[in-house]
Amino acid sequence: MALGGKPLDIFLDLYQRDFFKKINSVLDMGDQDVNIDYEDIEKRFNDLQIEFNKDFWKNSKNFPARPRVSSSIFWNSLGIPNADRMDMVKLERDKNDKNGHIIHDLNYPLKNQELFSKYDLVTDLGNNEHPFNIVEAYRTMHRLCKPGGYMIIAQAYLNGNGFYQFDDCTIDNIAAVNSYSIIHSCFYITKGKKNISIPLDKDYFQFINLNNIKAVSIFYILK
């Protein structure tokens, strides 16, 4: 449960394509870390001419130890002013992180209707497979997102660590019954610090030694 690896690559690519210019608010399901060290994120931001605030990112010097930088700081750095997180607990972080944190157990219905349809973007970066009541978790995700907003889901397909593991058609079916548009989908494969993405087609697995990788995940952008 963190923002890093291939999803981070995709987000930086989307930034170059001006995707986030239409996003003013984001809610991450889970109190997410950014899994990257200080030198790496500084270089990547400088390469893309993204302003790098050394004070905001100083906790990344701790990586892989904690406390780390929150995902909200990453979104702020991409120009998104409102970047909240939702979880059962709040991790101890740097006091520079002034973003909102909503305490909520995703096993239960979201009752605060002020949060309904509030966010331009809602993310599930390896979080919603951890609540026992996964249906309620995704119902909450739907309720948090504005009509016409975006949802990003990154979930384990092979070798995950949650209570549930998704098939390659799970999110397709969720999208179909809720009339979501699928903007992008792919598998991404992790081995050590390396990640590659491939089309969301299991036929491509014949080119990969699945015994020699860490994990396979699915990635979706829905509207």
Listing of model-derived features with the role each one plays in the protein:
Residues S25-K111:
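Class I SAM-dependent methyltransferase SAM/SAH-binding core
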Residues Q32-V34, A156-G160, Y188-T190:
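Short "lid" loop at the C-terminus of a central beta-strand within the Rossmann-like core
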Residues L106, D124-H130:
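Hydrophobic adenine-recognition pocket in adenosine-nucleotide-binding enzymes
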Residues K111-V122:
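A short acidic, Gly/Pro-enriched loop at the edge of an enzyme's catalytic core
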Residues V135-Y150:
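A short glycine-rich, Lys/Arg-flanked "PGG" loop and its adjoining helix->strand segment in the class I
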Residues S179-K191:
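Conserved S-adenosyl-L-methionine
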Residues K194-K223:
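Core SAM-dependent methyltransferase catalytic element
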